[in-house]
């Protein structure tokens, strides 16, 4: 009844079976497009891992080890994570806002539980400005960004990554 709006983690054995199915099924017959995320998915490190640089690196190694053309969504090369917004007013995604209204209004889930779901599953997690540096607005703009910044832009950004030989 809640669809994607759950805090349940993904089944990695099922993911392994799916990846194996596509790799063996297309081998020698076709070429796959490979990606973990896009503007309609939560951040890859948060969705599939635990927000750590190690998880982001594991995802990159897995993606780049598969047969096909890898696509890396903006910020994933830095290990950008979900924003974990604390207030509904920080979200812009109509799907997220409608789901909050409908599911809490129907009494299927509490407002606090739905905020947890949004923090994990909302598309807005991948729509925050790219974190170029730790300056105001993460170096993304001198104007006012449409989406709030991910609060971790001081720690996760392109400038930091370039200076760290062990970065994602």
Language-model regions: role of each:
Residues 1-168:
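Active-site and adjacent substrate-binding regions of carbohydrate-active enzymes
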């Amino acid at each position: 009844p809640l669809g994607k709006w759950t805090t349940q983690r993904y089944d990695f054995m099922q993911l392994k079976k799916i990846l194996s199915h596509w790799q063996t099924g297309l081998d020698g017959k076709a070429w796959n497009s490979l990606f973990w995320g896009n503007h309609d998915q939560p951040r890859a490190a948060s969705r599939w891992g635990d927000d750590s640089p190690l998880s982001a690196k594991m995802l990159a190694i897995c993606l780049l080890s598969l047969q096909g053309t890898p696509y890396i969504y903006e910020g994933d090369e830095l290990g950008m994570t979900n924003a974990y917004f604390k207030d509904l007013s920080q979200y812009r995604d109509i799907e997220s806002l409608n789901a909050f209204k409908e599911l809490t209004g129907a009494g299927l889930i509490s407002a606090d539980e739905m905020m947890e779901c949004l923090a994990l599953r909302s598309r807005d997690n991948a729509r925050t400005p790219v974190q170029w540096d730790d300056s105001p607005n993460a170096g993304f703009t001198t104007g006012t960004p449409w989406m709030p910044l991910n609060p971790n832009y001081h720690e996760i950004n392109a400038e930091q990554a370039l200076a760290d030989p062990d970065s994602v």
